[in-house]
Amino acid sequence: MKKTIALVLTLVLIFALACSSAFAADKGSVYWLNFKPELDETAQQLAKMYTEETGVDVKVVTAASGTYQQTLTSEMDKKAAPTLFIIGNQAGVKEWGEFAMDLTGTAIADELNTDAYNLYDEDGRLVSIGYCYECYGIIVNPDLIEKAGHSMDELKNFEGLKTVAEAIHARADELGFDAFSSSDMDGSSSWRFTGHMINLEYVYEEREAGAVWTECPATLTGNYMENYKNLFDLCINNSLTDPKDLATGGHDAEAEFKTGKAAFFVNGSWEYAAVSGDVPNATMIPYYCGVEGEEKAGLNCGTENCWAVNEYASDADKEATVDFMVWLVSDPEANALMVEQLGIMPYKHSIESSNGFLNDAAAYTEDGCYVFDWATNYQPNVDEYRAGLVSALNAYCADQSDANWALVKTAAIDGWATQYAAANG
């Protein structure tokens, strides 16, 4: 399929070059296939602003949550393919690196203030660059914690989190709110548990081995799956929604938190703009799960939001796309809109972020807490791997038996080895 796409795009480029005289005055155009649904409204606004300022046409299409790879595959097969897309991890580099322009020495690469989030292919080509720095964990409404007769000081480890969450759930009818918002397992939400929460298994394996991963390991030990179970069980069994109803989705966890129906919301810093208006003192705590010494745990910090430019776009479209990227990170008005939604952007002329959750991440680090790196970015054959985990978790939510949890562990640990072999065999 990808060879066919590459051939089609090459033929389109040859045709464009042959007709170059007809397009001598072409300013080029931009087609941004956006990865983040929460950014869509702002992205559409920015596209309109840029077109009005420059005359360059900018099209923004936002993939539905959990469908980016399918959407990218479909869109790349079209004559008017995206000129700006996302390659967010090493699996993406393997799959889409050949479609990415080498950004080394470009104007957008020169705007970076760090190369920590850059992704390179095996030939050393800079195929994608990070456009925001994020963190994730458990978002908390301190007012509801206090209303339930508890204190944020109790939330320093799994034992404290469990005590508070179970106490709130037991009194949910009386209090008028529950502990956790819904933990839906449909495509719009399951990534919070199969991509993010599962990261605790990977990071604690790294810490046990004494080094962070620099490449995808062939196998996992599974030594921390009981800790993953601790936190997952706490989320689904002390919630507004019965675990048996999570598979089909349809619950709005963000709205549940914003409207004061739940004290805890498993998510990340990208939610700050959405929830802070309703819960201005919302804060974020780590994935406490019962690991020894977790009182010194911090938040999960990193990114999988990395821009790539289509190698097979016309020269005019490539130039227009890079110019648009530079404008997003350097124009004061445009950048302010981006930072409001995304938080920290790693560029020289980007404004400072006021994102409270990123401030929480910094505070944990300054207090000497260890950071959870985004080891989850190494998930092999990510879509297939996560699909297997979703299937097992759905069976477990329907019937929380030991046998069904064993299937979850198989999907997470044996499934990793299976997908690694498929990706590297």
Model-derived features with residue positions:
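Extracytoplasmic/periplasmic substrate-recognition and gating elements
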Residues: 53, 146-148, 277-341
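Conserved C-terminal helix/tail region of periplasmic/extracytoplasmic solute-binding proteins
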Residues: 146, 170, 367-425
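Extracytoplasmic/periplasmic solute-binding protein
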Residues: 127-131, 136, 162-217, 262
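Glycine-centered hinge/linker elements that transmit conformational signals in sensory
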Residues: 165-166, 211-247
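Short helix-initiation/N-cap motifs at beta->coil->alpha
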Residues: 62-71, 158-160, 244-259
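Hinge/lid segment of periplasmic solute-binding proteins
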Residues: 88-139, 143-146, 283-286
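Conserved N-terminal structural module of periplasmic/extracytoplasmic solute-binding proteins
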Residues: 6-7, 20-92, 108-109, 293-294, ...
